Amino acid sequence: MDETLAEFFRRTILKIPMTEMMTILKTWNFMSENQLQTVNFRQRKESIVQDLVLLCEENHASLNDAAHLDIIYTQFHRHQKIWDVFQMSKAPGDDIDLFDMEQFKSSFKKILQRALKNVTVSFRDAEENSVWIRIAWGTQYKKPNQYKPAYVVYYSQTPYAFTSSSRLKSNLPLLGQALTVASKHHQIVKMDLRSRYLDSLKAIVFKQYNQSFETHNCTTSLQEGSLGLDINMDSRIIHENKVEKERVQRVTQEIFGDYPQPRLEFAQYKLETKFKSDLNGGILAEREEPLRCLVKFSSPHLLEALKSLAPAGIADAPLSPLLTCIPNKGKNYFKIRDK
């Protein structure tokens, strides 16, 4: 094993938290149980890493083995990346082809390697008939950079692929071509949907967010105590408050459902509109360029935050459709223009 590969193993193992080390190594399944028992996991991490690299060398580890370990680490820490969603479509009249995962992998890899001399492509099968693809990009003159790979998660026989955001935007057309041809689709477009939470993106595009998340029973009637009402308050006011709070909860439930929402961190709205005024000679009356403004809502869990606004009395119910349509439209980037 040369020094470059040994260093790649060392840096990959070094970033694994000690609390996850054994779990990830066993998932990798490259070292035997007996070999792992020879490692003292109570010593300094640098020493542990060195012992593990020696075991990799003893087992004649390859670059593909290192790539598999990196994929597993990324699967455990998928939320550290920002994921984009791509949607593919077939040409009108195209028949539905039988899908073969091995054929998909072979075709995908060949397309990239024919177009680009220096590229490393590795695959790892995952749950729900999905495959994780790790791509280390190089150029015609530089070897692949193993420390800044791109990731693609593709679910077989679906038109959706999820990709980690990459700085190498110039490679996106090639990646799109490889996905489209290998999956036997006709064209591919990037959706206006992005998040760190891959499972939530999947739930949105596959319309699973009302099934795959745990549901909660919200049918219990509201009691005066749960509404925070003062028992000494006028009974008519109590009744009015109770009716309004029940209405707010009913409307919120109709819009968002009983289930926890998919996790998104932001929604962005770009407004572009022509200036309109009944006053002649206004400052902006002759302006040809439209007025532009950008509004961004952000929260660790945006949809749950939006769901709680009306019940908390912060906003009126129902909320604007621009805020509540995010899961159904499958987008959290919006462009609003004049009709």
From Swiss-Prot:
What are the cysteine partners in each disulfide bond? Answer: none
Modified positions (Phosphoserine) in chain numbering: S226, S235
Q: Does the keyword Transit peptide apply?
A: no
Would you kindly state one Gene Ontology biological process term found in this protein's UniProt entry? chromosome segregation
* Keywords on record: Centromere, Chromosome, Kinetochore, Nucleus, Phosphoprotein
Provide a GO CC annotation, any one. Answer: kinetochore
InterPro entries xref list: CENP-NAC/CAD_complex, Chl4/mis15/CENP-N
**Compartment(s) of residence:** Nucleus; Chromosome, Centromere; Chromosome, Centromere, Kinetochore
The record's function comment reads: Component of the CENPA-NAC (nucleosome-associated) complex, a complex that plays a central role in assembly of kinetochore proteins, mitotic progression and chromosome segregation. The CENPA-NAC complex recruits the CENPA-CAD (nucleosome distal) complex and may be involved in incorporation of newly synthesized CENPA into centromeres. CENPN is the first protein to bind specifically to CENPA nucleosomes and the direct binding of CENPA nucleosomes by CENPN is required for centromere assembly. Required for chromosome congression and efficiently align the chromosomes on a metaphase plate.
How does it associate, per the subunit comment? Answer: Component of the CENPA-NAC complex, at least composed of CENPA, CENPC, CENPH, CENPM, CENPN, CENPT and CENPU. The CENPA-NAC complex interacts with the CENPA-CAD complex, composed of CENPI, CENPK, CENPL, CENPO, CENPP, CENPQ, CENPR and CENPS. Interacts directly with CENPA. Identified in a centromere complex containing histones H2A, H2B and H4, and at least CENPA, CENPB, CENPC, CENPT, CENPN, HJURP, SUPT16H, SSRP1 and RSF1.
Family assignment from sequence similarity: Belongs to the CENP-N/CHL4 family.
Protein name, entry field? Centromere protein N
Gene that this sequence comes from: CENPN
